[in-house]
From Swiss-Prot:
Compartments it resides in: Cell membrane
Pathway entry: Cofactor biosynthesis; ubiquinone biosynthesis
Taxonomic classification: Bacteria, Pseudomonadati, Pseudomonadota, Gammaproteobacteria, Enterobacterales
UniProt catalytic activity: a 4-hydroxy-3-(all-trans-polyprenyl)benzoate + H(+) = a 2-(all-trans-polyprenyl)phenol + CO2
Name used for this protein in its record: 3-octaprenyl-4-hydroxybenzoate carboxy-lyase
Subunit relationships: Homohexamer.
Length: 497
């Protein structure tokens, strides 16, 4: 097996274990609160993925903290380290707006990208692992799966890493999305998808085209890492997550037709839930501890009725928890940050860096550094960030700095804010914009304001005053002091602190 390509989740786990990145837990641990506590402590310490082999009351192992470090996210995407994810972003930028080769040399340079496109179509199989065991009808019982309850005030056990597969009535491609699902019965879950997400849009279109008809849905648990990460990556709207997973993996994504509907699911998945949403059937969802660090409000979402469960004979249940950062979604955000940069740079070449601090709940605050070219440039970039990718629709704060500022160093960013900003002149407030409905700080659910901070040096037209010049050291003096530094012996070991 190629060390950076995995046929399924188990290939990935084998490699993680070989590299000391997976720990098997044989001690019985309760999926009710205890697994979360262990996973949270492990993640905060930068520890390994965890395979709980004996969850209390269940025969099925629980996999947690799989993408608990940026390194493991990069490995899941087939890369050696996080910095290599910029190449994934460049590929996505190319796919979002492909340009024809400008000549033979350009064609040669782009040949690897064109060759990767050959891996985009899916490959349909039969007799696959995810259908080794099939239960249906009254035999369906979700309570046999060790679904975790993560926090003391959570309403019920919650599926967190399910890849929900849908298809709109007018679309060729399927949509893969990750939406949490509350357990409310032996064969019923609440599908919490926000109205702008792909699955919800497919459902809305289905209801309009097929009034009163059941909407087919399938949920895959424990897919291969490329498919899982494809579902959380900002792929272009015209590109299937399966196609992108094929690009990441370097081989076509293997799928199988579901038993009860025409949807296709990852052939190597550990567990697949098949069923439907009855139009008009909803239930109150929550409260749940969320990635914000708070319990969210209760709201109504569609009910997913499970008619079939297909799985491997010895299936593994893949799960996670969400809470105040750092959590697994925050770690994913840190890694995927590197994917976003080339996509934004293709549209806005003046962007030098783009950073989503994990403590900002992964997407609520962004810091952008630019090569400023004209007065008002920072405000254009703010508007671009909010509008170019739908992933930043809910970003509340955008800070724009010059390229002499390190976007990832709060010391630099705060220095720029406090020395280059006038609060009245350089603050942009935009009201009545889309906001995450989980953001209880907004005055209305789903609608709130955004703030842009222009922390760049001001150009003529933006100020009438003489602008400050940053202090710079004399390079000759620096070189001389470097030469005599050890001789000064200011520190005991003769070296700089």
């Amino acid at each position: 097996m190629d060390a950076m390509k995995y046929n399924d989740l188990r290939d990935f786990l084998t490699l993680l274990e070989q590299q000391g990145e997976l720990k098997r837990i044989t001690l019985p641990v309760d999926p009710h609160l205890e697994i979360t506590e262990i996973a949270d402590r492990t993640l905060r310490a930068g520890g390994p993925a965890l395979l709980f082999e004996n969850p209390k009351g269940y025969s099925m192992p629980v996999l947690c903290n799989l993408f608990g470090t940026p390194k493991r996210v990069a490995m899941g995407m087939g890369q050696e380290d996080v910095s290599a994810l910029r190449e994934v972003g460049k590929l996505l930028a190319f796919l979002k707006e492909p340009e024809p080769p400008k000549g033979f040399r350009d064609l040669f340079d782009k040949l690897p990208q064109f060759k990767q496109v050959l891996n985009m179509p899916t490959k349909r199989l039969r007799g696959v692992p995810c259908q080794q065991k099939i239960v249906s009808g009254d035999d369906v019982d979700l309570n046999r799966i060790p679904i975790m309850t993560c926090w003391p005030e959570d309403a019920a056990p919650l599926i967190t890493w399910g890849l929900t597969v849908t298809r709109g009535p007018h679309k060729e491609r399927q949509n893969l999305g990750i939406y949490r699902q509350q357990l409310i019965g032996k064969n019923k879950l609440i599908m919490r998808w926000l109205s702008h997400r792909g699955g919800a849009l497919d459902y809305q279109e289905w209801c309009a085209a097929h009034p009163g008809e059941r909407f087919p849905v399938s949920v895959a648990l424990g897919a291969d890492p490329a498919t899982i990460l494809g579902a959380v990556t900002p792929v272009p709207d015209t590109l299937s997550e399966y196609a992108f997973a094929g690009l990441l993996r370097g081989t076509k994504t293997e799928v199988v037709k579901c038993i009860s509907n025409d949807l296709e699911v990852p052939a190597s998945a550990e567990i697949v839930l098949e069923g439907y949403i009855e139009q008009g059937e909803t239930a109150p969802e929550g409260p749940y501890g969320d990635h914000t660090g708070y319990y969210n409000e209760v709201d109504s979402f569609p009910v997913f009725t499970v008619t079939h469960i297909t799985q491997r004979e010895d299936a593994i249940y893949h799960s996670t928890y969400t809470g105040r950062p750092p959590d697994e979604p925050a770690v994913l955000g840190v890694a995927l940050n590197e994917v976003f940069v080339p996509i934004l740079q293709k549209q806005f070449p003046e962007i030098v860096d783009f950073y989503l601090p994990p403590e900002g709940c992964s997407y609520r605050l962004a810091v952008v550094t630019i090569k400023k070219q004209y007065a008002g440039h920072a405000k254009r970039v703010m508007m671009g960030v909010w509008s170019f990718l739908r992933q930043f629709m809910y970003t509340k704060f955008v800070i724009v700095c010059d390229d002499d500022v390190n976007a990832r160093d709060w010391n630099d960013v705060i220095w720029a804010i406090t020395t280059r900003m006038d609060p009245a002149r350089d603050t942009v407030l935009v009201e009545n914009t889309p906001i995450d409905y989980l953001d209880f700080a907004s005055p209305v659910s789903g609608l709130g304001s955004k703030m842009g901070l222009d922390a760049t040096n001001k150009w003529p037209g933006e100020t009438q005053r003489e602008w400050g010049r940053p202090i710079k050291k004399d390079p000759d003096v620096v070189a001389h002091i470097d030469a005599i530094w050890d001789e000064l012996a200011i520190f005991n070991n003769g070296k700089s602190a």
